[in-house]
């Protein structure tokens, strides 16, 4: 191990504003100073030794003048000093002075103060010199019988460490600790003793557990956790022991400690696949989620349930617990609720879908009674989407869901109302038997709709699916009611003139007639020439939208009126009624056009809306069969095709997910029989405790490619040239939140290189954790240096630096070799993700940083270029494959990804292939990237530009 890899027990801040004290002044303070002076001097000595100073002349001074002191602060500092001070000569022999120190250790182990005894025992765990420990063994053994638990538990730790490092000093340690464990009452002492037996003598640990297996529930939680670990390790190594200990794990599921319950449930799942075991573990997880207040804990345990669901056999067991899982919805945290609803939706079946829908309906109603809050609105959206998915998967439920949800079309939260509208649109198209119900409920809430976007959607649905004469007449009535008195312009002018009359009689000056720009008369009061405003809330909804200048809804209304008028003509045979209805529809369109061209609206009507309304007027005036088919058949066919494509895509993604989860067994794969398996082959499964330990230490091993050239070797970066005196190359190992640089340094000269130091610096959101230690390289020798770099966000980072060294025996200045830059690839931190179209549009509007990248490539196929961008940026294409299929000379697609730091990245690809340049013309266009942070937008843009350069070569 290098110095940088050694375990560091002590970290002390070094003040940089003062000069380091001299050895003479320190010696004087240690010899003649008072307790306070000696304390300060000892602190300075410790800091200097940690900084690399030797100070051999002070060792005897400290032994003579500081070691005999009984001050507790000094005793604590001395333990640190003895830990770091060199205890051996250069040839490895123990210093003679350490014999005196050893005697001081022995006295402290027999000290009446339990803190001093315990601290000394903890210190002995760090000693690596057997000669120092040997005389202390009787005193250490005696500490096992001390009255205070602090001393006893540290004595156990000391014995365990000594036995592990120097077994010959205490060969009977397992037996000694086993006897101690049998008689011990303190929970922490028992835990340490049991932990030692697990690692030192597992058979004795199992013997002890067998004698008290029925009392495990009465033990403290720290001991229960160790027992769970032992059972897992034993059963992992020897599966035949499972039957012996599985009941103990079941009992520990009832522990009062949440940590024990969590570990016991995880162990139970790994030891048994029986439905009863899976159900017990899942029930334990659910109880933990409900009872624990920390949202992070809830999310972690929910992840365990999601992992259980991924196993096909376990999924069937979890389906019976859907209603229990829904109890988690009582948690106010949105992320927990989102994950819970997704899990419940994945597990729902025809057996429990009815109960699920009842619970979700109650939750929806609850959100209506809660005071408005951002999370409440988002939670309502989640509930609506979940009910939407349930209704699509289980059509029988749609009739129960629709009446409740349609109340929310009039909700002030447009996002929730839009989700309801999307659900209603799909339901009315898919389920013919529900069309009458949906139209009826839509007509009920139509007048209360507050959002113009929802109003447009409701108009479209009513126009498309009203099929009876009565429904058509009802739609026309609702439209007239929502539009108010017509003609709109004249009625508004009259209303304004009428509002000028005061409530009380006031003498009014002469009134003059004015001609407006539309050619109509308006009256002007002598009291005021400004137009007064009446409360806009009194206006009917549609009239209010039009006067606000939103004429897009007018174009939608014109289409709806045209559809229902054409349908009315087909249903009613009387010519008079036909003409009357068509004329009424045309009158409404004409009055809207008149309003749009007047000065009354806040914004004038656009040319597009004028064209649309004029087209509808022409269609109604001519009533051609072709237009009839387009309005009444083709529109619905387009919706049907879109919904079919969406459903097909969902089925395809579900199929891919199920294929991932299903383990395919080949016909010639060997079958493993547990009874016939050799012991050394039973450890094929990964040890979960070992994996979690590696993850905590940052040593998580990713699955590398089978070919080493395609995995590790392609991440080796050459830092210097082959002709440089020092050759260096680095393997860049990327973990989740940090980067480990494993640098190989080779001395290519015939000289000894002293103080060879790797000096690194970073650019971007990277931070060097520690400075690599200097080393000495013999001629043609090599060494590995490791450096850790922390990563805080998804930005392109650069690590640069140099190697400096001294040549042994040379009088010249320090030599320096400049290293090549190491560019950190942000693709290691970006993962493909998915979101709805509405969420994409919302984020697109909110994100302020945009990076526009111009397409510059030799590729000639639009689809190939899109796939190249997806591969280069690690993003997911949200645009359905059907929308991208075919060839029309241009393509537009939306891409989305999330970083492991929770940052969102959006991209819109807009590309085309110039037809006039022939079939070999290169793809042109641009890619717009949007992100919340500037770094993310720029980094993705750089990545795309870099990938384009490679394709252009």
Curated annotation (Swiss-Prot):
Gene Ontology CC annotations of this record: COPI vesicle coat; COPI-coated vesicle; cytosol; endoplasmic reticulum-Golgi intermediate compartment; Golgi apparatus; Golgi membrane; plasma membrane
Sites of N-acetylthreonine modification: 2
Pfam family, one: Coatomer_b_Cpla
HEAT repeat feature ranges: 96-131, 132-168, 240-276, 277-314, 316-353, 396-433
Family annotation (Gene3D superfamilies): Leucine-rich Repeat Variant (1.25.10.10)
Localization (cell): Cytoplasm; Golgi apparatus membrane; Cytoplasmic vesicle, COPI-coated vesicle membrane; Cell membrane
Keyword Transport: yes
Bilayer disposition of the protein: Peripheral membrane protein
GO molecular function list: structural molecule activity
One GO BP: intra-Golgi vesicle-mediated transport
Alphabetical list of InterPro entries matching this protein: ARM-like, ARM-type_fold, Clathrin/coatomer_adapt-like_N, Coatomer_bsu_C, COPB1, COPB1_appendage_platform_dom
Keywords: Acetylation, Cell membrane, Cytoplasm, Cytoplasmic vesicle, ER-Golgi transport, Golgi apparatus, Membrane, Protein transport, Repeat, Transport
Positions bearing N6-acetyllysine: 494
Tissue-by-tissue expression: Predominantly expressed in the upper one-third of the oxyntic mucosa and in most regions of the pyloric mucosa. Ubiquitously expressed including platelet, liver, heart, spleen, lung and kidney.
PTM description: Proteolytically cleaved between Ser-528 and Ser-529 by CAPN8.
Function: The coatomer is a cytosolic protein complex that binds to dilysine motifs and reversibly associates with Golgi non-clathrin-coated vesicles, which further mediate biosynthetic protein transport from the ER, via the Golgi up to the trans Golgi network. Coatomer complex is required for budding from Golgi membranes, and is essential for the retrograde Golgi-to-ER transport of dilysine-tagged proteins.
Self-association and partners: Oligomeric complex that consists of at least the alpha, beta, beta', gamma, delta, epsilon and zeta subunits. Interacts with CAPN8. Interacts with SCYL1 and PRKCE. Interacts with COPG1. Interacts with ARF1 (myristoylated); this interaction is required for binding of COPB1 to Golgi membranes. Interacts (via trunk domain) with ARF1 (via switch I region); the interaction is direct. Interacts with KCNK2 (via N-terminus); this interaction increases the channel-mediated whole cell currents and promotes plasma membrane expression of KCNK2. Interacts with STX17. Interacts with TMEM115.
Name of this chain's protein: Coatomer subunit beta
UniProt source species: Mus musculus
